[in-house]
């Protein structure tokens, strides 16, 4: 096996991209290094950057769809191969890039027969589609498909109410996460006194891994800047004051309960097929090499949402089963 060799600075802290690849329009990869770091610094920066990459970068998604021909989400429309639910799921997968602030409107107006793809979406000039070939629907007859869309820029993911809006439109649970995955690793040298931080970033194509790295860094810096203004820590808020009631602090009670339960059971020996999961969820987990309860607990809610065909409802069902049977919770984000 040939060992990889890279050139790093000996004194000045520097970063650089050591590898980049485009698997498709909707999957970009970048590998970066930061060095030289003192012992322990790489892990501190790596953990913070991973959290910022996955949770602090805004993305643009379709969040609502409206059509006069739709009676309910699970209906079928004559002349359209897909069900309404399948069309909504296809719209959820559309990757957008924008300079949008807040929300805006878009639309689809197509006459069949033929395929409806992302390129058929009529967008405002400040929103663009990353992959025009993404499939939306198949029209098998000469009918007209008209859909109004709401587009929103935000971060994280939102769970919208399952009911329709008052205007008859249907919510789409958006995942505003342009970074699909991020990992960090550490290489030690000089007898363990110096470290190199490696950051791997996969994006959905709405921004490059390098752009994601820059934006996550800016957002992380913005979060820390208030700590530099020590003279303003008791600044009067005047009309902007807001009193927040604090709940009882039960962290240690929950931790003790979790530790006690973990000691009573061998997590490796509890297989997920023993936990009342529906076959579809079980198969999704199995395809991601999750076979035991321990495998499942090594993932966060965000990790599950990135699995193919996984939905918000599936995550909620898993959380309910973990709480009911094992008194265990699954974190939203992985530290």
From Swiss-Prot:
Documented EC number(s): 2.7.7.6
A GO MF term: protein dimerization activity
UniProt keyword list: Chloroplast, DNA-directed RNA polymerase, Nucleotidyltransferase, Plastid, Transcription, Transferase
UniProt-annotated stretches for the region Alpha N-terminal domain (alpha-NTD): 1-231
Gene Ontology BP terms: DNA-templated transcription
Keyword Phosphoprotein included in the entry's annotation: no
Family: Belongs to the RNA polymerase alpha chain family.
Domains (record comment): The N-terminal domain is essential for RNAP assembly and basal transcription, whereas the C-terminal domain is involved in interaction with transcriptional regulators and with upstream promoter elements.
Pfam families cross-referenced by the UniProt entry: RNA_pol_A_bac, RNA_pol_A_CTD, RNA_pol_L
GO CC terms in record: chloroplast; DNA-directed RNA polymerase complex; mitochondrion
Class of enzymatic activity (EC top level): transferase
InterPro entries named in the record: DNA-dir_RNA_pol_insert, DNA-dir_RNA_pol_RpoA/D/Rpb3, DNA-dir_RpoA, RBP11-like, RNAP_asu_C, RNApol_insert_sf
Assembly and interaction partners: In plastids the minimal PEP RNA polymerase catalytic core is composed of four subunits: alpha, beta, beta', and beta''. When a (nuclear-encoded) sigma factor is associated with the core the holoenzyme is formed, which can initiate transcription.
Gene3D superfamilies, per database record: 5' to 3' exonuclease, C-terminal subdomain, DNA-directed RNA polymerase, insert domain, RNA polymerase, RBP11-like subunit
Organism in which the protein naturally occurs: Helianthus annuus
Subcellular location: Plastid, Chloroplast
Catalytically driven reaction(s): RNA(n) + a ribonucleoside 5'-triphosphate = RNA(n+1) + diphosphate
Region feature Alpha C-terminal domain (alpha-CTD), mapped onto this chain: 263-335
UniProt name for this protein: DNA-directed RNA polymerase subunit alpha
Highest taxon of source: Eukaryota
Role summary: DNA-dependent RNA polymerase catalyzes the transcription of DNA into RNA using the four ribonucleoside triphosphates as substrates.
